[in-house]
């Protein structure tokens, strides 16, 4: 599922708009 930012599940959107792994 896509949330704000369109990151893959398990990833969080950072302040600069990129996707970072949360694990």
Swiss-Prot record:
<keyword id="KW-1015">Disulfide bond</keyword>
<dbReference type="GO" id="GO:0005125">
    <property type="term" value="F:cytokine activity"/>
</dbReference>
<dbReference type="InterPro" id="IPR003463">
    <property type="entry name" value="GBP_PSP"/>
</dbReference>
<comment type="similarity">
    <text>Belongs to the GBP/PSP1/paralytic peptide family.</text>
</comment>
<dbReference type="Pfam" id="PF02425">
    <property type="entry name" value="GBP_PSP"/>
</dbReference>
<feature type="disulfide bond">
    <location>
        <begin position="7"/>
        <end position="19"/>
    </location>
</feature>
<keyword id="KW-0202">Cytokine</keyword>
<protein>
    <recommendedName>
        <fullName>Paralytic peptide 1</fullName>
    </recommendedName>
</protein>
<dbReference type="GO" id="GO:0005615">
    <property type="term" value="C:extracellular space"/>
</dbReference>
<comment type="function">
    <text>Causes rapid, rigid paralysis when injected into Lepidopteran larvae. The physiological role may be to reduce hemolymph loss following injury and promote wound healing.</text>
</comment>
């Amino acid at each position: 599922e896509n949330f704000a930012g369109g990151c893959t599940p398990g990833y969080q959107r950072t302040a600069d708009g990129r996707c970072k792994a949360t694990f």
